[in-house]
């Protein structure tokens, strides 16, 4: 994934430059930004590890594969952002406010912050371009972060956005310290960076927690599955449907279908096979499908089904009350 590689390269170079600037200037804001970039670098490494491990072949112990490794490592990123980035930055900022020390060579900090802004902007632009390839038309960035099943892009987007805002905080901290002669402002800048990282960590953790628990298919994908199941000559009727993302590209589909009483066992088997083929043709990521047949009786449909809330049988067109990630 280009966005992760670009972010990794940018953060590694930025971390070294910021730490050198901290050693020269003694700025708490620069130290906070150094730790921020180190945390981001570690995060990109974790995302790559998770992506690699998710591709392992399924085993007897993990029959559905390892797709959720990507969600787990994205959650670890949130933990790192909070513990390594936010907590340290806030602690160091408070220490600088209580025990201020004079900045030296602030021009070095300005140069490094400017260079960092350019590199972080390049990384964010790469992430935006890659996200636009999969973002649905009409969906804003907030919807994209909330609805996507791919964890790496939202993490990189949030990291890079937080990094750019954090650079502004650090710049203001150094600038106000120099203009006012009160070095406490440098500590305030560090605290601002820490609070920003805490917010980013909360958002990443909240979204990846939901994915780790297991999210259903999106409304659009569910509609395609229902249409595929009921759209064949077998005259199947959906009673209830359960879907769960095993990974971004692996969807588990389990459903109970009502079948005509006159179907023979051979016809039923052939019909279920045909229905599964239609589902996979409509939704290629539906790798695992389980269908339980039952004799159809009117009114048998589950009205409280969380995936298919309302199915208008007269028009054969499904409507849904819920909407989840794409």
What are these regions (language model features)?
Residues 1, 27-30, 183-187:
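Residues that define the loop-to-transmembrane-helix transition and helix capping
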Residues 1-17:
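Topogenic membrane-insertion module of multi-pass membrane proteins
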Residues 1-6, 35-45, 72-84, 118:
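Alpha-helical transmembrane segments of integral membrane proteins, especially early/N-terminal helices
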Residues 12-20, 25, 33-37, 41-46, ...:
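Hydrophobic alpha-helical membrane-embedded segments
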Residues 23-52, 90, 94, 154-168:
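Acidic (Asp/Glu-rich) catalytic motifs at the cytosolic membrane interface
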Residues 40-55, 131-141:
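Short, charged cytosolic
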Residues 47-69, 99:
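Aspartate-rich (DDxxD/NDxxD/DxxxD) Mg2+/diphosphate-binding motifs
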Residues 69-326:
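Alpha-helical transmembrane segments and adjacent TM-loop junctions that form the membrane-embedded core
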């Amino acid at each position: 994934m280009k966005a992760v590689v670009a972010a990794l390269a940018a953060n590694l170079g930025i971390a070294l430059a910021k730490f050198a600037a901290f050693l020269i200037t003694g700025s708490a804001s620069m130290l906070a930004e150094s730790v921020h970039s180190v945390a981001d670098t570690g995060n990109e490494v974790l995302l790559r590890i998770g992506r690699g491990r998710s591709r392992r072949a399924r085993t007897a112990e993990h029959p559905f594969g390892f797709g959720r490794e990507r969600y787990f490592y994205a959650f670890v990123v949130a933990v790192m952002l909070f513990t390594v980035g936010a907590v340290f930055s806030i602690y160091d900022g408070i220490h600088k406010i209580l025990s201020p020390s004079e900045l030296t060579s602030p021009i070095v900090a300005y140069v490094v912050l400017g260079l960092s802004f350019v590199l972080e902007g390049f990384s964010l632009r790469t992430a935006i371009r890659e996200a636009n390839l999969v973002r649905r038309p009409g969906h804003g960035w907030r919807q994209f972060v909330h609805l996507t099943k791919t964890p790496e892009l939202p993490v990189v987007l949030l990291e890079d956005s937080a990094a750019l805002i954090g650079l502004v905080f650090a710049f203001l901290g150094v600038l106000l310290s120099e203009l006012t002669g009160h070095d406490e402002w440098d500590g305030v800048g560090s605290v601002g960076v820490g609070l920003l990282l805490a917010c980013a960590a909360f958002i990443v953790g909240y979204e990846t927690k939901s994915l780790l628990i297991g999210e259903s298919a999106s409304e659009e994908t569910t509609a395609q599955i229902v249409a595929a199941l009921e759209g064949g000559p077998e005259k199947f009727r959906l009673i209830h449907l359960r879907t769960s993302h095993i990974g971004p590209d692996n969807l588990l589909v389990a459903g109970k279908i009502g079948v005509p009483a006159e179907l023979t066992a051979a016809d039923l088997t052939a019909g279920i096979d045909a229905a599964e083929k239609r589902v996979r043709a409509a939704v290629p990521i539906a790798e695992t499908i389980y269908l339980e047949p039952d004799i159809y009786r009117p009114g048998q449909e589950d009205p409280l089904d969380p995936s298919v809330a309302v199915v208008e049988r007269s028009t054969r067109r499904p409507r849904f009350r819920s909407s989840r990630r794409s």
